[in-house]
């Protein structure tokens, strides 16, 4: 069956504006009728929902208040619902989303699912947040196998996480401390950066080329929000 993600719907809209004949985008069945040619068109791409989720979780982890502009909260229901369940304050105003960290984070269980369920691409970031919640959280990965490579690196920072089959059991809150860590993929690298914001002391995240595949100038954006973060050419 076809993926139902907003990005698929947005691409179909763009191609249709260029003269394509595509129906069913956003459903399990997409029908494409061939055309002789495509023509030019103007199209505004939708905002990156995973980048928005990453910054929202980072704000919650660092006990800050951040307003994300130009987001689509309707594309983030599963993530925002879990953040609210964890005690994170959210305020929606049009295309703006303000994230206000609560006084105490509550543990929540998360299971990754196809859209519109909780996205696997926000699983690692959410795990970092749960290391700061008081209690036990269970994060279950149902989309990809072996997508817990970040667990051992989070453990280097002091996280208490145990893998049990497709699930990771997170016990919190953990007082994270800086240490050298190594990113294994795109979202794991984002999770390690978030954990570094929480950790006391200096953390060096290696292999940040993973990070650049999915985030544009994330270090500069975090620095503008007050983070003490520097990029090293040999990282």
Please describe what each predicted stretch is:
Residues 1-235:
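Short, structured segments at the rim of ligand-binding sites
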